[in-house]
Amino acid sequence: MRGAASRMIGHLAFSEVENAVEASSVLCLPMGSIEQHGPHLPLNTDCVIAEALTRRIVARWGDEHDLWQLPVVPVGLSREHAWAPGTLSLTVSRMAAFLRDIGLELVRSLPARNLLIVNGHGGNRGILEAVTREMCDFGLNIATLHLGAMMST
């Protein structure tokens, strides 16, 4: 039985990953953004929320379903907040290419073919829906959890 911290891919040596991650494992990828959230919250709010929820999911169901947490993707599509100092945003074409590259690298470097994306930023939703369909062609089974959709009434 592993704790949540030991199921964080970025904290393991390559030899540990090689011996632990299997074809049936589920890789959990938190995604956020670096953008304004008003004068009172940090720019990385979406990252913190997505990473914390992913950590809780892995802590709760990691052993039972062989879940592994990947490092957070901190930059997304945030052009609507470009006016605010500190906002980092990719273009649609760069974000799409970045997501495809992540998918290809996961397939190249790990045996797991199951990916859960935990998206903490509403601006990423459209591009994720489009590109994850393409990423299935890489042999990945992908589910995306959009936190904003969960909080809608």
Regions found by a protein language model. Name each.
Residues 75-153:
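Active-site histidine-anchored catalytic micro-motif
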Residues 60-67, 106-111:
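A structural motif corresponding to the C-terminal end of an alpha-helix
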Residues 9, 49, 94-98:
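Soluble or luminal CAZymes and related metallo-dependent hydrolases
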Residues 46-59:
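Short catalytic helix/loop segments, enriched in acidic residues and glycine
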Residues 3, 20-21, 39, 62, ...:
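Soluble secreted/lumenal catalytic domains
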Residues 1-38:
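Active-site and ligand/interface coordination hotspots across diverse enzymes
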Residues 37-43, 84:
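A short glycine/serine-rich beta->alpha loop
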Residues 21-31, 65-77:
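Short coil-to-beta-strand
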